[in-house]
Amino acid sequence: MATYSLANERLRALEDIEREIGAILQNAGTAILELSKEKTNERLLDRQAAAFTTSVQHVEAELSAQIRYLTQVATGQPHEGSSYSSRKDCQMALKRVDYARLKISDVARTCEQMLEN
C-alpha cells in the first residue's frame, strides 16, 4: 500500500505543478494585456510580474525534484516501492532455467543417439 500512496503523492505533486503552470500562463497573459494598453497600470503589472516570477521559480524547483527522483529510480538504485529489480531478476532466472532445460534435452538426445549406434 505504501507504493500506491507514494505514487499518488507523486501524481498529486505533478498535478500541482500543472496548476502552477496554468497560473504562470494566466499571469503572463494579464501582463501582456496590460502592456498592450496605452496607459498601463504599473502596480498591476508589477504584481503580475512578481507572481509570474515566483510561480516560475516554484515550478522549476518542483520539476527539478521530480527529475532527481526519476533519475534515482532509473539508475536502478533500490528504493522503497520498486519491484522492478526483483521482477527482472525473476524473469532472468526463468530464462536461465528454460535454457538449462533446452541444453539438458540436447545432451539427453545426443546420449540416446550414441547408445543407439
From Swiss-Prot:
Modified residues (N-acetylalanine): A2
Taxonomy, superkingdom: Eukaryota
Disulfide bonds: none
One GO-annotated biological process of the protein: protein ubiquitination
Tissue spec. comment: Expressed in cochlea.
Record has DNA-binding as a keyword: no
GO cellular component, one term: core mediator complex
Chief subcellular location: nucleus
Keywords: Acetylation, Activator, Nucleus, Transcription, Transcription regulation
Compartment list: Nucleus
GO MF annotation terms: transcription coregulator activity; ubiquitin protein ligase activity
Pfam families given in the database record: Med11 (PF10280)
Family under the similarity heading: Belongs to the Mediator complex subunit 11 family.
Subunit structure as annotated in this protein's UniProt entry: Component of the Mediator complex, which is composed of MED1, MED4, MED6, MED7, MED8, MED9, MED10, MED11, MED12, MED13, MED13L, MED14, MED15, MED16, MED17, MED18, MED19, MED20, MED21, MED22, MED23, MED24, MED25, MED26, MED27, MED29, MED30, MED31, CCNC, CDK8 and CDC2L6/CDK11. The MED12, MED13, CCNC and CDK8 subunits form a distinct module termed the CDK8 module. Mediator containing the CDK8 module is less active than Mediator lacking this module in supporting transcriptional activation.
Function, in words: Component of the Mediator complex, a coactivator involved in the regulated transcription of nearly all RNA polymerase II-dependent genes. Mediator functions as a bridge to convey information from gene-specific regulatory proteins to the basal RNA polymerase II transcription machinery. Mediator is recruited to promoters by direct interactions with regulatory proteins and serves as a scaffold for the assembly of a functional pre-initiation complex with RNA polymerase II and the general transcription factors.
Name of the protein: Mediator of RNA polymerase II transcription subunit 11
Species the sequence originates in: Mus musculus (Mouse)
